[in-house]
A protein has these predicted regions:
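N-terminal targeting signals for export/organelle localization
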Residues: 1-4, 108-115
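Conserved redox-active cysteine motifs that mediate thiol-disulfide chemistry
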Residues: 27-41
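A short beta-strand-turn-helix
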Residues: 4-22, 64
Length: 115
């Protein structure tokens, strides 16, 4: 059962840009209430969709370089990468079904059926 991978600025290139499947990056912080709401949703999606998408988490308090480069000013922010390029940016918390629907717009293999 896949879980979101905690990454650092140093891991960003190898885990996100060079990944062999789409990657959803969750920019978060431990003190952020909406981030704590999104966390379990991302864990479910990571487990249910592990063949289709990789989910990683970047703590912006501990890793400010990438967040700054990508102009992440609000959290939670999620950026979807496909073939090493950002294709969607989601700011704020979202219900699981809404997030799956949004991801499926860019990742054909994402199942939006309720599980």
């Amino acid at each position: 059962m896949a879980k979101p991978l905690e990454i650092t600025d140093a891991m960003y290139q190898s885990e996100v840009i060079d990944a062999d499947k789409p990657v959803l990056v969750d920019f978060w912080a431990p003190w952020c209430g909406p981030c704590r709401t999104v966390g379990p949703i991302l864990e479910e999606i990571a487990s249910e969709q592990e063949q289709n998408i990789k989910i990683v988490k970047l703590n912006v308090d501990e890793n400010q370089q990438i967040a700054g480069q990508l102009r992440v000013f609000n959290i939670p922010t999620m950026i979807l990468y496909k073939d090493g390029q950002p294709v969607d940016k989601i700011v704020g918390a979202m219900r699981k079904q809404d997030l799956l629907n949004r991801l499926s717009q860019n990742v054909d293999t994402i199942s939006t059926a309720s599980v």
